[in-house]
């Protein structure tokens, strides 16, 4: 099978599942959902599967997708010591989250230089890669929603309704603003600290909260919503070539 084929990337994150269809190098569509989007005219020749979920949850999703596309070839992606000219910094490479690994690979190939990779989703994950493709390591911190939920779950009287979350100028003057803007400032301070450590590196950002941070960070960023899927395509194609 040529790698220039119809590919479905299944990216099972902590809170959502993202399905990305490729025709060659072109992204045809991207869908999010809890189950496989079988109601499409797209028939993948190969499926690249990447999951950060538990073994049990991953197995259920695997069965769901395989039932929808029984004739498709299947490659489960895992973090490796090296892939696509990128070297994993982890002593135990397989313990680096597959979403982080695929983001690192994609960012290196997109930027071809020193780059900081930020995935702002359920967690805020930051990885640093140099121009030679060496992954230098990274960080994992709570995402914006996780910080808010943690604060609310551990306090009795910090409460607000979603309609109370409005933008304002100056210091927050309501509980809703105090919590939401406080969590934003925590995330921004974390990212600004990393920028201080790597001021000459380019920045690539992805994830559901990417735009919210992008607008307030004051750092030149490039946003790639499909970064993990692009990395999956690169790594999957390399493995597919190796299997033939």
UniProtKB/Swiss-Prot annotation:
Q: What is its main location?
A: cytoplasm
One Pfam assignment: Pan_kinase
Q: Write out the residues that bind substrate.
A: 90, 97-100, 175
UniProt keyword terms in alphabetical order: ATP-binding, Coenzyme A biosynthesis, Cytoplasm, Kinase, Metal-binding, Nucleotide-binding, Potassium, Transferase
Which co-factor is required? NH4(+); K(+)
The GO biological-process annotations, alphabetized, read as: coenzyme A biosynthetic process
Q: Which residues form the active site?
A: 99 (proton acceptor)
The record, for InterPro entries, names: ATPase_NBD, Type_III_PanK
- Cofactor detail note: A monovalent cation. Ammonium or potassium.
Care to name a GO molecular-function term for this sequence?
pantothenate kinase activity
Recorded family membership: Belongs to the type III pantothenate kinase family.
Name of the protein this chain belongs to: Type III pantothenate kinase
Source species: Marinomonas sp. (strain MWYL1)
Q: What is the lineage of its organism?
A: Bacteria, Pseudomonadati, Pseudomonadota, Gammaproteobacteria, Oceanospirillales
Gene responsible for this protein: coaX
């Amino acid at each position: 099978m040529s790698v220039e084929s119809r590919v479905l990337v299944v990216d099972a994150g902590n809170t959502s599942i993202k399905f990305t269809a490729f025709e060659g190098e072109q992204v045809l569509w991207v869908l999010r959902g809890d189950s496989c989007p079988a109601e499409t005219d797209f028939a993948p020749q190969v499926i690249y599967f990447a999951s950060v979920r538990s073994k049990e949850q991953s197995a259920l999703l695997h069965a769901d997708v395989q039932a929808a596309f029984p004739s498709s070839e299947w490659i489960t992606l895992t973090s490796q010591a090296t892939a696509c000219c990128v070297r994993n910094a982890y002593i135990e490479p397989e313990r680096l989250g597959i979403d982080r690994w695929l983001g690192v690979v994609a960012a290196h190939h997109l930027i071809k230089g020193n780059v900081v990779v930020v995935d702002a989703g359920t967690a805020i994950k930051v990885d640093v890669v140099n121009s030679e493709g060496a992954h230098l390591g990274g960080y994992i911190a709570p995402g914006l929603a996780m910080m808010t939920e943690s604060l609310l779950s551990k306090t009795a009287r910090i409460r607000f309704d979603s309609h109370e979350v409005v933008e304002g100028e100056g210091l927050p003057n309501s509980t809703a603003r105090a919590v939401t803007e406080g969590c934003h400032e925590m995330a921004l301070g974390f990212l600004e600290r990393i920028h201080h450590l790597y001021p000459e590196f380019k920045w690539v950002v992805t994830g559901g909260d990417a735009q919210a941070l992008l607008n307030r960070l004051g750092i030149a960023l490039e946003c790639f919503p499909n970064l993990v899927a692009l990395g999956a395509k690169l790594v999957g194609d390399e493995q597919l070539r190796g299997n033939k």
